[in-house]
Amino acid sequence: MIDRFLDKRNPREWLCLKRTVRFGETDAAGVVHFLELFRWCHETWEESLEKYGIALKDIFPTNEINTSQLDIALPVVHCEANYFQPLYVGDTINIELETEKINESSFVLRFKFKKNGEQIGSTNIKHVSINPITRKKCALSKQINLWLHESSSNF
């Protein structure tokens, strides 16, 4: 359950995250492999939900909860990435997450990757809310709607 005290928090607390590039995330040239950017996006989204106060088990299937037991599923229906500079092992980056609710059943997550204050990459990932049994579009959950609303506040 989302606590009321979150209403007064700064969205920066759950939308700006930091990470260090690890060896296993690079290719033979020592440059971050392109797929890692999307993995970092999903990890950033998960961490953002947790920091905001949403339990991941309420959003994603787990070993205890399968997809059919969830109220909604949020598949990716479109994604794109832009790479402006390479990243190497040991680089520290900041990942900034911006949200945009498109309609009652879909939203876009926009990620900016920055190193030393300079943007070095970006991604856009569109999710659509569906009923996990019928696979038809449905309204976003109350939790996701609240997270999107509070995350879209200017910070």
UniProtKB/Swiss-Prot annotation:
Protein name listed in UniProt: 1,4-dihydroxy-2-naphthoyl-CoA hydrolase
GO MF assignments: 1,4-dihydroxy-2-naphthoyl-CoA thioesterase activity; fatty acyl-CoA hydrolase activity
Transmembrane stretches, start-end: none
NAD found in the keyword field: no
Active site feature: D27
Upper classification of the organism: Bacteria, Bacillati, Cyanobacteriota, Cyanophyceae, Synechococcales
Lineage: superkingdom: Bacteria
GO biological process: phylloquinone biosynthetic process
Catalytic activity field: 1,4-dihydroxy-2-naphthoyl-CoA + H2O = 1,4-dihydroxy-2-naphthoate + CoA + H(+)
Annotated EC: 3.1.2.28
Pathway connected to this protein: Cofactor biosynthesis; phylloquinone biosynthesis; Quinol/quinone metabolism; 1,4-dihydroxy-2-naphthoate biosynthesis; 1,4-dihydroxy-2-naphthoate from chorismate: step 7/7
Annotated keywords: Hydrolase
Family listed: Belongs to the 4-hydroxybenzoyl-CoA thioesterase family. DHNA-CoA hydrolase subfamily.
InterPro entries linked to this entry: 4-hydroxybenzoyl-CoA_TE, DHNA_CoA_hydrolase, HotDog_dom_sf
Pfam entry (one): 4HBT_2
Organism: Prochlorococcus marinus (strain NATL2A)
Role of this protein: Catalyzes the hydrolysis of 1,4-dihydroxy-2-naphthoyl-CoA (DHNA-CoA) to 1,4-dihydroxy-2-naphthoate (DHNA), a reaction involved in phylloquinone (vitamin K1) biosynthesis.
Claim: Acetylation is one of the keywords in the record: no
